[in-house]
């Protein structure tokens, strides 16, 4: 099997700065990490490879410094890493990003073999749109399985895959054909510890680097800010909410009285909650 995992190097959310003119994230000088959701996707891909054989190619789009995240992915056990980097990609929204990544995945298929599965995290912590994975699937005409918690089985003979998809109030069990694209949920698979051999191999490995032309992109106007119709009107930090702690003396009060006092206090601050609970009780009756 050939599996492609799309990861993204994201800024530490606690130290994000926003450009005052373009309303894009300023990454210079901000510590970066691999998008946490992408690590769950990477671990699931590695588990599939370990069980069924094949190789895992990790792909990211970003500035040259994103090579650091790719080497980290190699230490976890990925077989190959490709960096899609070009000044033309700067300022890409989800539409332009999914276009560039889909073109690169098509090039990967031509160079290293068509992927059977493309994995992504469900979303990134810097954008939180959850649009790039489905956008890639649409452009590559792949079946998309989103918000997947677990890959339960793969039948290479029939080219079928079964997954568990987390849904409100339960779990969906879905069966699909390969190839497909899967977006992984958080908490599904904790990333493994890389071995010493993998760490040494990662340090020696060459990171494949493609610019827009090398990735097979012919229309540069679909990349970067020029290819991004999304307009961010305003970016701001929410006003911190005041938090208070209330201490209730229970020495001389019965527990039921304490509970009633707490409920009354909560409803006083959140009247909508009282109405919602009253409606729920009426329906249940």
From Swiss-Prot:
PROSITE patterns: ETF_BETA (PS01065). Gene3D superfamilies: HUPs. This is Protein FixA. One of its GO terms (molecular function) is electron transfer activity. Belongs to the ETF beta-subunit/FixA family. Pfam families: ETF (PF01012). FixA and FixB form a heterodimer. The keyword Transport applies. It comes from Sinorhizobium fredii (strain NBRC 101917 / NGR234). May play a role in a redox process involved in nitrogen fixation. SMART domains: ETF. The lineage of its organism: Bacteria, Pseudomonadati, Pseudomonadota, Alphaproteobacteria, Hyphomicrobiales. Keywords: Electron transport, Nitrogen fixation, Plasmid, Transport. GO terms for biological process: nitrogen fixation. InterPro entries: ET-Flavoprotein_bsu_CS (IPR000049), ETF_a/b_N (IPR014730), ETF_b (IPR012255), ETF_beta_N (IPR033948), Rossmann-like_a/b/a_fold (IPR014729).
